[in-house]
Amino acid sequence: MALVGTPTNRTSIDLPVDVSNEILQKAQDSSAVMKLARQIALPGRGAAINVITSDPTASWVGETAAKPVSNPGLETKVMRAYKLAVIVPFSNEFRRDVAALYDALINRLPGALGQKFDNTVFGGTAAPGSDFDTFASVTQHDIETDTYAGFVAADGDIATHGGIMNGIVLSPQGKGVLLAATDGDHRPLFINSVAEGAVPMILGARTELSKGAYVAGTPNVLGFAGDWSQAVYGTVEGVKIDYSADATLDLGSGNVINLFQQNMFAVRAEIEVGFRADTSVFNALVDA
């Protein structure tokens, strides 16, 4: 949603530190990428990130022989902060108690921020800029035809590029494919028991579930596997909050809300976030 016109009754809210931290934590909890990737403090002007592309090599030497010199391969990437925002309308009853407003923010906004961040990293949404890495063009492996073989192929490809598969993000659709996978005796391959219904690990790699990991296409992307030690995200500061009581909200498709006329107000949440990764050590998991 977007604000239309120039609001005349807009106020900035300084959230208490504990509330701001809780909102940010909720966003992180709703994002599989934020759970698996490393987090760094990101200055507003951006930061240079050193990515190790190869390790130094040790060699055997004689007792008095000169010791070999080997340098690691390094690549420098610039991580920039891009703004992610959402507006949510509320009824005026929320104004009666500030705590109710905070509760509403905590319950509704972080999930929207986290899911959009995931979907952007996974290529379902266009990157906000050239210094934001995505997995839109990574190597694909079919996990629908032969699920186990597909994961083994992904693990091998990641290893070929110098990574170790240590994290897998599945969409709900991808989880369905895994739950349907059975061995020759019709026993489930990827869950410990039917009662659990969850996929805790695959080939020793931790798994997370995210709606943002599904990208419709030909084929459809059901999830991603990779070496998450080679992925970094950063945030400039906590979630910024503004509200307006007399703006007009354009909901799209000709739908408009007049906040003053309908006894409502709208809250806008923003976060500045960046993402960088060695995309060669990530694979997309697709259907046939």
Predicted regions and their residues:
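Short helix/loop capping segments that flank catalytic or ligand/cofactor-binding pockets
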Residues: 57-61, 97-99, 177-180, 233, ...
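Short beta-strands and strand-coil junctions in structured, solvent-facing domains, enriched
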Residues: 36-39, 96, 274-276
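Assembly/oligomerization interface modules of large self-assembling protein complexes
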Residues: 2-84, 111, 151, 281-282, ...
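Alpha-helical scaffold segments that mediate packing/assembly in large oligomeric complexes
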Residues: 75-78, 85-163, 185, 270, ...
